[in-house]
Amino acid sequence: DAARDAGGLLDWGDHEARTLEDMGYPNWVAEKGLCPGLPDWTALKNPDCAANFVTPDSGGKGRWLEGPQSWHQDLMPQRLEALGLDDLWMVKFAGGADALWAELEAAEKEGRGTIIFNWTPNFTDGAGFTFIDFPPFYDGCRPEDGGDGACGSPDGYLKKAVNENFPNTHPQAAAIFKKMSFTTSHIGAMASLVDIDGMTHEDAAAAWLADNESVWKAFID
């Protein structure tokens, strides 16, 4: 909004995909029955659930693997305490995104549960990932805003924008971009081709276009 209001950019609509950054789990956690009741956050109150997420560094508690502490400071430890989950769960801070992805692979190989910080859309949407349903976010629910932190994260939009001159200099491209709208599964599949299958961006784009002709043709008709 600030960039648009400063001038030079035009709001060109939103993608269908919504954005979210929060704690969740790979779908195989639910498929293995490691925490019955998920994605409802109250399932985390069950000691038998927490026991399936214990790691050598978690002191006997179930572990949430957060991103680096610089990302959100103590947001997740505060949430655990506010929801009354800190007797059963603890937060470990990862060194970066690569550590989060390595944890997904390690946990599946070891057959143990894992709850990690993640965001959508990204490649994990293609593999299958579910965010925990925490109490809804509302303005003022976080500690820095006067709340107790017993709330999840807000979802958001995935915005499109163009240079203010673009519709005049490239009217056909501008019209196509205006109609373009990707879903979470579309973007997850694209990202998976690069992050999981190891394709170059160019090869991934070609593969996705070949497999999704009905999607992109709707943008150019």
Residue spans for each PLM region:
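Soluble non-cytosolic domains of exported or imported proteins
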Residues: C35-L38, S70-D74, A94-D98, P167-P171, ...
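A residue-level marker of the well-folded mature domains of exported/periplasmic proteins
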Residues: H15, L34-T42, P47-A50, D57-S58, ...
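A bilobed periplasmic-binding-protein/Venus flytrap-type ligand-binding module shared by bacterial periplasmic
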Residues: E21-L34, D155-T169, S192-L193
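A conserved helix-loop-strand patch within extracytoplasmic ligand-binding domains
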Residues: A2-L65
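Ligand-binding pocket segment of bilobal, Venus flytrap-like solute-binding proteins
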Residues: G60-Y138, P143
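C-terminal functional modules
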Residues: A174-D221
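Surface-exposed patches in mature extracellular/periplasmic domains of secreted proteins
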Residues: D11-W12, F53-D57, L88-A94, A189-L193, ...
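C-terminal lobe and pocket-closing loops
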Residues: P121-S181
